[in-house]
Amino acid sequence: MESVEEQPHQALLVIAHPGHELRLYGWLRKVRPLIAILTDGSGSTGISRIDLSRDLCESLGGEIVVPGRFVEPDFYSLILRGETAPFLAFAQELAHIIDERSVDVVVCDSVEGYHPAHDFCLPLTRAALALSASASSRGVRHLEYRVVGQPRTVNDADARWPVELDDATFSEKIRRSRRYAEASGSVLAQEVAYMFDTYGEDAFRHEVLQRAGSEQPRLYDGMRYFEMRGEEQVRAGRYRSVLRYTEHLQPVEAALCARS
């Protein structure tokens, strides 16, 4: 079975928000990928997390090549308005990186239904690979990882590229994850605490990459979690409208696919 022990010549990690790289801490330390970040992670606080991620990634040997293409609220506005040109331009930028840096593995956030930006990374990277002049001929692999789900298990046991962290790296990962979350002063701190409480810290000793598209979004009464959460925020008066998958995100994904 193929393993990430067979290190790629050059990997590209595409993530929705700064901080996601913590999920692949051991892999990042081993592979030292290029990293492209979709948004700046500012969310409702207005405070970017890019500098936190730059310090972390550079200390592990990674290189941030796209430090947050969109201010996070702007990303949602573009999706709600159905604008595709900025995302196609970003896909073309990623394609250029794949070609110029001879990337042979692209890794992205999986589609879990938790957050629209997370779910957008898969179609974005698919478009980038389709637009690349060399990805097909060079056999560039396309992999994904879970951002919020149980990190240890995947749907298909035959589609696993596991990394098992040694004690020192595991302790370092937990310590730096907590430190990053505290420094961010955002909802990320709550999410990190929730994941450690839910899955247990030891689950994060395991990092699993799987073939892109293996994951399926969890649905609640036919809705992705971010739609349900959006409805709650509208009722609370925090949002004016709900970003929905079929109405907003899917058409932008389809346009990306059609143009690439």
Positions of PLM-derived features:
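Metal-dependent de-N-acetylase/amidase catalytic core
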Residues: M1-L13, P86-S260
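Active-site rim/loop-helix segments in enzyme catalytic domains that contact anionic ligands
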Residues: M1-R101, R126, A130-S137
